[in-house]
From Swiss-Prot:
Subunit structure of this chain's protein: Part of the 30S ribosomal subunit. Interacts with proteins S7 and S18. Binds to IF-3.
Family the UniProt entry places it in: Belongs to the universal ribosomal protein uS11 family.
Gene Ontology biological-process entries: translation
Organism: Chlamydia muridarum (strain MoPn / Nigg)
Protein name as annotated: Small ribosomal subunit protein uS11
PROSITE patterns: RIBOSOMAL_S11
Keywords, ordered alphabetically: Ribonucleoprotein, Ribosomal protein, RNA-binding, rRNA-binding
Cellular component aspect of the GO annotation: ribonucleoprotein complex; ribosome
Gene: rpsK
General function of this protein: Located on the platform of the 30S subunit, it bridges several disparate RNA helices of the 16S rRNA. Forms part of the Shine-Dalgarno cleft in the 70S ribosome.
HAMAP family: Ribosomal_uS11 (MF_01310)
Length: 132
């Protein structure tokens, strides 16, 4: 009896693309900070979050965790040839400004900083106020 020979799927190595400019999307929530770096078309080059970098619980919402996440995302994006970025901020978390500072200090040239925080035109009812 002859067994069907199946080929093992080989893991494809990501090719290093030379992308000179891109967009950095920083989503800073009260619980976490997510940094995504894309090319101008919107294809993701690299991403990092405070949780991916190794922080958990309340430490994820700190400004330092956002700094480390932004440095991690910038390092992997710069290895694919990224030099100049536009920064798009979303949210009101603690890691907004510190993430932008980390991107500048890691060697990326920031051309534009945009604030795209979604503001409702009196849409859904907000959750109940927290009483401490």
């Amino acid at each position: 009896m002859v067994k069907n020979q199946t080929q093992k799927k080989g893991v494809k190595r990501k090719q290093v693309k030379n992308i000179p400019s891109g967009v950095v999307h920083v989503k800073a929530t009260f619980n976490n900070t997510i940094v995504t770096i894309t090319d101008p078309a919107g294809n993701v080059i690299s991403w990092a979050s405070a949780g991916k970098v190794g922080y958990s619980g309340s430490r994820k919402s700190s400004a330092f965790a956002a700094t480390v996440a932004a440095q991690d995302a910038a390092k992997t994006a710069m290895s694919s040839g990224l030099k100049e970025v536009e920064v798009s901020l979303k949210g009101t978390g603690a890691g907004r400004e510190s993430a932008v500072r980390a991107l500048i200090s890691s060697g990326l040239i920031v051309s534009v900083i945009r604030d795209e925080t979604p503001v409702p035109h009196n849409g859904c009812r907000p959750r109940k106020r927290r009483r401490v």
